[in-house]
Amino acid sequence: MDDRRISRRDALIQTGGTLVAVAFFQSPLFAWARPGETTIPFVDQPTAPPPPLAGLNQLDWEAQSLDSWITPAEKFFRVGHYGVPEVDAAKWKLQIAGHVARPTSYDLAALKALPKKEVVFTLECSGNHGFPFLPGAIGNARWGGAPLAAVLQKAGRKPAGVEVVFYGADQGEEPIQYIGGLGDKMGEFKARAPFARSMSWAEATDPANLLCYEMNGKPLPAANGAPLRLIAPRWFGISNVKWLTRIEVIDSRFEGPFQAQRYLTVREVPHGDGTTVWTRTAVGKSLLKSVAARVAVVDGNHRIYGAAWGAPIARVEVKVDDGPWKNAVIDKGAEHEFAWKFWHLDWPSPAAGEHKITSRAIDREGNVQPAQDDPFIAGKRTYWEANGQITRTIKLS
């Protein structure tokens, strides 16, 4: 997005500022369709995004006739806050600094000389499904690069180092406010700073994390973070910092604007004594999610298709109307821990009329994707991290 855009956050606020519980997901999964299938459209369709969000390159799978489990780079969603920076790869270096025993820097050739690792990972924007016009900020790619843990461990952590901050080349101005102890506003100024997010040292040295320079076997495109980005497979997109220039180990909690101000999930948590506590947590790790994406029929045989992601998935369950939960068949992705799973459920002899289809994902530890009336979802007051069970409506003739 260019400088004429307003921020995505402001755009969402201007469109109403109210949490939308019902979300939409468009996915025909044509690659696993039966010959001769006809798609039955859902009654509930996503609304058009407001102009500031029209350039996010959302995945509109119905229109694009998806034919691959891997999302092509040109169809991958693009979310940025300060635009795509101009980075000269020939002069670019990654700095490793802060509370490390051996501060150092790497150019791209030095990183490529390290042992290469690949991971198939479904990257999702933390605002995906928070509003009905944001259903496609997600994609699945094969990412390649150097293991982050090896680079950090070679630098060596000093005893005081507890948190790792990842800085991008994209920069912008942010308002800084002074707030008094009684809540009174003391002052404000604007500061220009690079985009940054952080995680703990233990989280940063997760063996799954990559300093990524390849996407789907090709050089990482500029729009997706070239020459180097962080790929952290257990985390929402906001933590997968693009256009990396600096990694700094610090001795305290990082409170940059995209860590402690903007990307916060606010929940109302009732206590047994009738009081309420409001919690504010930074958007962090991916959450369980599954959606019914398409219903198709051939020779009178109906089938529901969908996708699930966000954690190591053990199984997916689907129910129609108030019927029982039934196990879906995983068609693709079971062998990849961090990638979405495409699934289907045969729906024999459905009655004519309107039906509601709901799916839920269950991970390997037995955690179940929550229902919309679960306190974890019902008490949420922000649109980030929307992972309540999604119900789609369809009408059969």
For the regions a language model picked out, list residue spans one by one:
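Structured, non-membrane catalytic/scaffold regions adjacent to prosthetic-group chemistry
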Residues: W32-S397
